[in-house]
Amino acid sequence: AGSAKEEVEKALKAIKQKAKFLKSDVEGVYKIRIGNAKKAVKSLSKLKNKKGMFEHTFYWIPIEKWITTNVNAMQKEIKKLQKGIKKTDKWKMDLHKRHFDKMHSTELIIKLTEAVDKPKVDLENPQKIIEVQIIGNKAGLALLNKDELLNLSGK
């Protein structure tokens, strides 16, 4: 069947994307530098029902910026990202953390959403997603449309 890394390489080849694997401190999590990550994930989404394509990889999440896991720094970056959310857009924040125990997830979400001044929160059917991926002392942030995120965990 092959490894997860081979699967990543095969999937990216299928959408004609070249990628560079970066150092990751978490087993099972790949950090990949790629041209247009949002476009790549959209293309991968079209292949999600192809048999044998995604047997080892379940989450494909584009990150726009990596910063330190300092709450103030994250709030500052989220304040910039949220400018891409219209007042009429429904939005939510997704937070995933690994090797970070300085703050409980709920407390952290409350702190980070304080930086967002858009009124329409919708956890079930958002138009925009503020993605926060914390891995140790680094936080990856992105503002995504629903189709720029690939979650195959429930397939």
Predicted regions and their residues:
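SAM-dependent transferase fold signal centered on methyltransferase-like domains
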Residues: A1-K155
